[in-house]
Structures are given as C-alpha cells and as structure tokens.
C-alpha cells in the first residue's frame, strides 16, 4: 500500500475542475468540500496559493474530500492561463477531470481548449457537471449535454460513456435539498467513484530510474544514483541503460540506501545501484535504468508547450521556427530544435502551442513525459510529450 492509502485508509485519486471561465468551477469545488470535505469557502479557494514548479508560478488551490470508498485531492485554478500552465507543467497530475459546463451557455472556447489539453497531457477520465440547471431551460440542458458528448468524442474521450450530472453548484452550496442542489453533488461523487479507475500505484509499474550521478567504487564496480521514478528493482535483475548512446544491458548487483544494502528498491526512494561489468565511462547523468523492453530512446516528438511571459521570468521577445533551446528532460539538458505547426510563424511569450521537437541525441521517453525549456540556464517554458515521432 502507498503512504497515501495508509494515511487515509482508502485509495487516493487526484482530480481537478476544468472548463470555461465563469461556468462555476470554483463554486462547484466549494460545494463539494462543503458536503464531502472540510468546507473551504469560495473566496478562500479563489485566493489560491502560488505554487512553483520548474520556476513557473501557478496559482492553484488544493482541497481534499472523501467519499466512503475514496480520498480525493482536488485542484482548482483561478485563471484560464493558470489551468493551461497547470496541465502542461503538471503541478498536480490529474487522474480525472470534472468538466464544468454552464447549462445556460453550453460549451465555449476554453471548454474546448481544456478538453484538448486534458487529452494531450494524459488525463485518463472526464466526468461532466452541467451547472446552472436551476436557471437554464430543460431543452437547452439536453442540447448542451449532446454538444458536450460530441466534443469529448471529437477529442478522443468516450463521449457516449462519460457520466453527465446536471445540477446547480450554487444551490448545492446553499444546502438546497432539491435534485439540482446537494443531491447533484452526491450524484457527482457517486459517478467519480464508479467511473474513474484508481490509477496504478507507481510501484506496480515497470522499473525506471533517471540517473543523477555515477561513481566508481574500487573493488565493487560502478554505482549510479537517483530516485526510482516507478516500479522496483531487486539484486540480480537484468536492466537496460537507455538514452544518449546505444542501449546497454547490465545486471543490478546491489541496491544501497544511506550506506545500507537493501533487498530491493522501490518507487520514491533515493538509491545507489551497483552495476555488474559496467565501466564508469559507459554511463552518465541523463540516461535511465529501466526494466528491459519497457522504454525506448527517441529524438523526435510532438509536444504541448507553454512559453513563459516576460513577467514570469521568460523571454522578452517571440521566437521563430528552428529555435534551438535546451530541453531539460528528467535529469539533463539536451539541445533540440522546435518546428512550429499549423502554419504558425512565431510564438509569443505567454503562448500555449503544439510543436515538433528534434533533439540532438536520443533520450528515453514515453508519451506524457514532462520537460522544461531552458535558455542559458533559465526556464523559458514547459512542455509535455503528446506523441512520439521517431
């Protein structure tokens, strides 16, 4: 069991509210915490604390609540730009998103943008809450549901299966006992519990460790250190060293932590791993150790990126096609060039765009890997791999 499960005695899921401005994301967050958590007032959520991830400041409010079956951590962002940054930078990885759509207005531009981003960054499940049902016309609500389902299907979510709950976050917040009031929140929680699968714990995934440092210990061989990102490793297991150069195979002959030898190392631990027959110069920071056959090195990929504004410490000027910054992937900087898509000629600070990246050397990667874009050692943007090209 993970530490989180032990702490709450229940499986843990990360969720977030997404949707167009003023459709009621924060009111819904307040209503959920009122009935299922430690109540957090609307104006407290709206004064979200600032969180820094990779040098990027994002205002995010974290609240928590629980049903009989699960514990949920919930993130709500005050501004649209913060949602975009949060999803790309992954300040809070969302396992599922609650898409809030006003029953009066229906889907709007940010509704689409948030759905597309959710898909690109790997949010697994979406549950829909059609809000403001108390002031919307019944026919309009049916139409909105149809439109939202079509939109979800268009962006690769199972639009026909996605649960849709109709209600009024404001009524729920006011303790109204009608169908659109507290009952709609109960129904939403029920749907989250039923529809969203608990994500596999990192320890159950295949072993992966990004190498941070390499040492040579006389008489014992080469030791690499780093934090195990996922899975576990036992002495005697075969592993691959991937990225930067040709993939090599080796055997783990020991796992150490604080000078003690362990039987195995698992996700979340900072460890040293002894490698059999591997020379000091054959391994370097930026490579990863992984279970054989589970991850491959790549140079070309598509990504969703957010470029910092000048006020956020980013560039002061736009960049153009073939811009060549450094990409900080896991533990190392690699130079690469950016190709702009969809006929775009330049990218302004503050923009969120889809790009193609070609690195100078291959790096172990999967869809969903997050990275920082740096120039002269400072972060100028952030991104997430949306598709591997080669």
Curated annotation (Swiss-Prot):
The lineage of its organism: Bacteria, Pseudomonadati, Pseudomonadota, Alphaproteobacteria, Rickettsiales. Its EC number is 3.6.5.3. Residues 19-26 are annotated as: G1. PROSITE patterns: G_TR_1 (PS00301), G_TR_2 (PS51722). GTP hydrolase that promotes the GTP-dependent binding of aminoacyl-tRNA to the A-site of ribosomes during protein biosynthesis. Belongs to the TRAFAC class translation factor GTPase superfamily. Classic translation factor GTPase family. EF-Tu/EF-1A subfamily. It catalyses: GTP + H2O = GDP + phosphate + H(+). This is Elongation factor Tu 2. Residues 131-134 are annotated as: G4. One of its GO terms (molecular function) is guanosine tetraphosphate binding. Residues 55-59 are annotated as: G2.
């Amino acid at each position: 069991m993970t530490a989180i499960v032990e702490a709450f005695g229940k499986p843990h899921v990360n969720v977030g509210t997404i949707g167009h401005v003023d459709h009621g994301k924060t009111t819904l967050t307040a209503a959920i915490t009122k009935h299922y958590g430690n109540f957090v007032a609307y104006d407290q959520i709206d004064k979200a604390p600032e969180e820094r991830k990779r040098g990027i400041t994002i205002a995010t409010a974290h609240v928590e609540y629980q049903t009989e079956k699960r514990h949920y951590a919930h993130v709500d962002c005050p501004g649209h730009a913060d949602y975009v940054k949060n999803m790309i930078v992954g300040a809070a990885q969302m396992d599922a998103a609650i898409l809030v759509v006003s029953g009066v207005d229906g889907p709007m531009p940010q509704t689409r943008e948030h759905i597309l981003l959710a898909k690109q960054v790997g949010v697994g499940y979406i549950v829909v809450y059609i809000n403001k049902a108390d002031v919307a016309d019944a026919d309009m609500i049916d139409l909105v549901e149809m439109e939202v389902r079509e939109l979800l299907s268009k962006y690769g979510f199972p639009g026909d299966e996605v649960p849709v709950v109709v209600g009024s976050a404001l009524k729920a917040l006011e303790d109204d006992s009608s169908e659109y009031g507290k009952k709609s929140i109960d129904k939403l929680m029920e749907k989250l519990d039923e529809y969203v699968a608990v994500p596999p714990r990192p320890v159950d995934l295949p072993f992966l460790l990004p190498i941070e440092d390499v040492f040579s210990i006389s008489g014992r061989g080469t030791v690499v250190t780093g934090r195990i990102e996922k899975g576990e490793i036992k002495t005697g297991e075969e592993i691959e060293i991937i990225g930067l150069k040709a993939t090599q195979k080796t055997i783990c002959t020991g796992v150490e932590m604080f000078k003690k030898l362990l039987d195995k190392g698992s996700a979340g631990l900072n460890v040293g791993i002894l490698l059999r027959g591997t020379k000091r110069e054959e391994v370097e920071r930026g490579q990863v150790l992984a279970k054989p056959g589970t991850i491959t090195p790549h140079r070309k990929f598509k990504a969703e990126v957010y470029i910092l504004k000048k006020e956020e410490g980013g560039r002061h000027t736009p960049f153009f096609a073939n811009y060549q910054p450094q990409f900080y992937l896991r533990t190392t900087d690699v130079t690469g060039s950016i190709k702009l898509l969809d006929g775009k000629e330049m990218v302004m600070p503050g923009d969120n765009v889809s790009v193609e990246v070609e690195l100078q050397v291959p790096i172990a990667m999967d869809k969903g890997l997050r990275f920082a874009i740096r120039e002269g050692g400072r972060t100028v943007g952030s991104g997430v791999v949306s598709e591997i090209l080669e």
